[in-house]
Amino acid sequence: MLKRCLIVGCICLIAFSNITYAESDPSKWPLVKEAFFAQRPMADAPFITFVAPRRAESGAQVPLEISIDQTQADANAIKTLYILVDSNPIPLAATYHLTDKLGKFKLATRIRMEMDSYIRAVGETADGKLFLGSVEIRAAGGCGGTVDGDENAIRAAAGKIKLNVESPVKFGDATPATFIIKHPMRTGLQRDLVSQGFVPAFYIQKAAFTFNNEPVMNVDFGVGTSEDPYLRFNFIPSTPGVLAVKAFDNDGKEFNHQTEVRN
């Protein structure tokens, strides 16, 4: 998958290097689809839906909500969800690995967009079937540009986590949880304001959520996820316990946090 990201990223960088704003182009999707899901059939999925702005205020922080109107007991239960942005230099924004502790999956997050684009949510079942949901959003300038500040201080401050569970908790029912981790999520496409050299990619790669030491959700982040990654998702606690998260960045640093879940 990483190799495919790099191939598509190189192609897109060449294609978009002189473009800062353009209307969404549906013809880009076949290229992205072939790179990530070569020759695999994919069905439209009315059960994958979005809540998103028609035009985002900032391409660096585009709010996105995704819902899957099925449970993990359904015949075509989605086990893996890929979020792709057709027109981004690196299209894959994040991959979500789902479990039955999520019930009907509902997620709010924030992504980067370099230009107007279709956003794709591709769901994969345990037996490899693929299902597609799409939404069009207008936005610009979220992946490149210039950054400033003391890079050493920014890196030192990275990794602080907030993890909250909404109360009151009704055990056995969907319960909202919110995760935020402080991190610049450098894309590798941004330039230093002073030197004008490219700032190396520096981002959260993975986050693993557990409840009472049992998996809830694993996330593979890409640089298409916004600065200070934000997730709001529902999970189903059956008893009091501990919701925990373990995150890793591409420098190999590990960050941990947990919160009690109780009435």
Task: Briefly describe each language-model feature range.
Residues 51, 63-71, 176-184, 192-197:
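Short edge beta-strand/loop segments characteristic of extracellular beta-sandwich folds
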Residues 25, 140-162:
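Low-complexity, Pro/Ser/Thr- and charge-rich linker/hinge segments at domain boundaries
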Residues 99-108, 223-232:
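Aromatic sugar-binding surface patches on proteins
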Residues 125-132, 248-257:
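Short acidic/polar inter-strand loop motif in beta-rich domains
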Residues 114-118, 174, 238-242:
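Extracellular Ig-like/FN3 beta-sandwich strand-entry sites
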Residues 8-17:
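Bacterial N-terminal signal peptides
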Residues 136-142, 260-263:
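Short beta-strand edge segments in extracellular beta-sheet folds
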Residues 32-61, 152-174:
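N-terminal edge beta-strand
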